[in-house]
Amino acid sequence: MTELKFKGVYVEDIGHLTCGTLTLTENSINFIGDKGGKSVYITGTDVDKLKWQKLGNKPGLRVGLSDGGAHRFGGFLDDDLQKIQSFTSSNWSKSINQSNLFINGWNYGQADVKGKNIEFSWENEPIFEIPCTNVSNVIANKNEAILEFHQNEQSKVQLMEMRFHMPVDLENEEDTDKVEEFKKAVLAYAGLEAETEQPICLLTDILCTTPRGRYDIKVYPTSIALHGKTYDYKIPVKTINRLFLVPHKDGRQVYFVLSLNPPIRQGQTHYSYLIFEFGKDEEEDLELSLTDEQLDYFNGNLQREMTGPIYETISILFKSICNLKVTVPGRFLGSSGTPAIQCTHRQNLGLLYPMEKGFLFIQKPVMYIRFEEISSCHFARSDSGTVTRTFDFEIDLKTGSSLTFSAMDKEENNKLFDYLNKKEIKIRNSHRIDNKSAGYGSSDEDDIDPYKSTVKAEGREQDDDSDDESTDEDYDLDKDMKKQKNDKDSSEGSGSEPDDEYDSGSEKDASGTGESDPDEENIEPKKKESKEKKNKREKKEKPVKEKAVKKGKKTKDPNEPKRATTAYIIWFNANRNSMKEDGDTLGDVAKKAGAKWKSMSADDKKEWNDKAAQDKARYEAEMKEYKKNGGGVEKASGPSTKKSSDQSPGKQFKSKEHISDTDDSDDDEPLKAKKDESDAASESSGESD
């Protein structure tokens, strides 16, 4: 048998089990992952040891290599052991040893570095094994060794950190430090340089804003080491995928940003970006420990002695070591004359940089948003008040989520708008802010915030309603008083009785003779003046009464039919629970629903449009029956009041003369008193006759 093939076998790759096909031939072991996954090729001469031990909950094959590495395959059947045993013994002259894992659940044992693997065992029985290549960083802290691991994005459950406590044996004191020796042994096979090697460059007391602190930075050919007062980091050069150099808004500082994948960790916090801050006028001479071969390798971009601003020399150094371009801002300039726009994101103050191929936000959290990830942008009014000098900038991603940058200065609106147009990025409210106007016609504020324009429209409608409902706005008191005086003079000349509608005869001439007292001329101006004051006072109190009427209008009739529901609301209520995930707020669910509704076809929406049409027909039928039974009659009370008042100006004046200054329920009592006084005057006049 020259070939042995197993399907449905998986290989362990940084905590992720990649499924594929394992093929054993006379000269090699070949594993090909399904759907273009990981592939492994091992020659027969590189195989050192073979062990049959479980991987997960199924039997597995551990293939030890001659260089100290190992590959583990799982998903076999118990009967496959005999097949593999006979094949390896006949073709490779290798036997398979059965190795049982110690699974008592103990958390203590012996931690050793065997080959390129960290093996934790108890009395020579293995408990678990971790390849040293999976380790991203080792921190030695007194009697404790902290291991941090690389991450596999395909794995749902990932090993982030592991700590080994190594107590000191007081009876057998040794000069060697167990933790430090363990650290050196792991670093030897983890692809990270040990501290004993000579770095290319040493940068001291460098301010790092993310993660916060001052660090000494050692630059190696394949890694970068950061040493702080509390934390140390080792970053492989291959994990650095982008470099940014951007100025601060004040023009005095410069940010140098490193993008990392996978990110480094500090406790439970991940840092996908490192931000170094340098003074723009700060200069420093750097001496690089480079050989002639290394200088030739970097094509003359680096020199043994480099002078100039520190941010320039460091950016050139990292550009050569990482073999990456340094991304700088393009031609965009904000109102401050710099490429930075000050704003806030989730209550954190920061700077937004429109770059040539994306947006860079510094600093909590640091984000780089590429244009290819953006579906559209939106300008919205800030929520700080009705009259505001700031706006919000929203970025909608193709994944369905959105990012909001708030409190941007209004002067940045047009500059950012023109920038998006040049980059051909879709803008939902595609218009600039050119004119500044006040009042209801403020087009710039209405364009930024559609909700505000709606509120203003409602305000205009309310003003129109108040003009229509006002019965005393066009009333002229002086004309009415002159008319009364003319009517009074004409009635005295003709000897006729005064009109009962005007109470002048009953108030001024109790004898009924039609003649006035000598002091009547002095009393008339006082009464006129008092009426003018009372009229002004009533006009001031009018808005209070109008508000009371308007509040009454807003009260909803409980018998009024329920309004018709739109197709989107019916669909949203039916599918809200299925779209909600753990931790989602109502706003998150609404955004997901809106995006999903827009993507639905007309056929998908047909069911809900039909339901909305049925609900609309139901509402129209119920509303017709409601109005037929007298519903909504109260709305006609305003115009009828105006009509009655327009027909009788005299009665209108009388009502204003006798209206009380208060809004109590005793408003009719002055009218009753006046009527009694008038009746008494008529009786006395009859007795005198």
From Swiss-Prot:
Q: Domain of life of the organism in this record?
A: Eukaryota
- Feature: DNA-binding region: 561-627
| Gene Ontology cellular-component terms listed | FACT complex; nucleus
Q: What is this protein called?
A: FACT complex subunit ssrp1-B
What organism, scientifically named, is this protein from? Caenorhabditis elegans
Q: Where is the composition biased (Acidic residues)?
A: 461-477
What molecular functions are annotated in GO for this chain? DNA binding; histone binding; nucleosome binding
**Tissues expressing the protein:** Expressed in the germline.
